[in-house]
């Protein structure tokens, strides 16, 4: 299983916003930069104060983190990833979150080619 580290430094978030590729969906926006010769992904999740009270923001963060964890093995490694939550991440169905994440990762070229064995 791939190990994912977390992004916590502000300058890394800003670098992804300015230089990274992005794709937007109903529940989230994903920003990505490919890192050279790195065996692991780094993930950062942001939720705006506009989304709601702390309970709702933390719920959105937990749901996105779990969606990523469940699909982590399908992603290529060596990326810095920032996911920005939208309102639908709080109260939308979990299946929508998963479909959205996989679709956006596919658009950004992060999905591993599936083997049909």
Where are these predicted regions, by residue range?
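Positively charged, solvent-exposed patches that mediate nucleic-acid binding
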Residues: 1-117
């Amino acid at each position: 299983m791939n190990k994912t580290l977390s992004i916590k430094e502000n300058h890394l978030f800003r670098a992804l916003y300015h230089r990274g590729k992005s794709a937007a969906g109903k529940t989230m926006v994903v920003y990505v930069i490919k890192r050279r010769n790195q065996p692991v992904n780094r993930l950062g999740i942001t939720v705006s104060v506009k989304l709601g009270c702390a309970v709702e923001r933390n719920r959105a963060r937990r749901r996105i983190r779990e969606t990523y964890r469940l699909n982590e093995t399908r992603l290529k490694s060596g990326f810095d990833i920032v996911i920005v939550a939208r309102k639908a991440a709080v109260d939308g169905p979990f299946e929508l979150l998963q479909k959205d994440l996989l679709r956006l990762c596919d658009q950004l070229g992060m999905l591993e080619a599936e083997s049909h064995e």
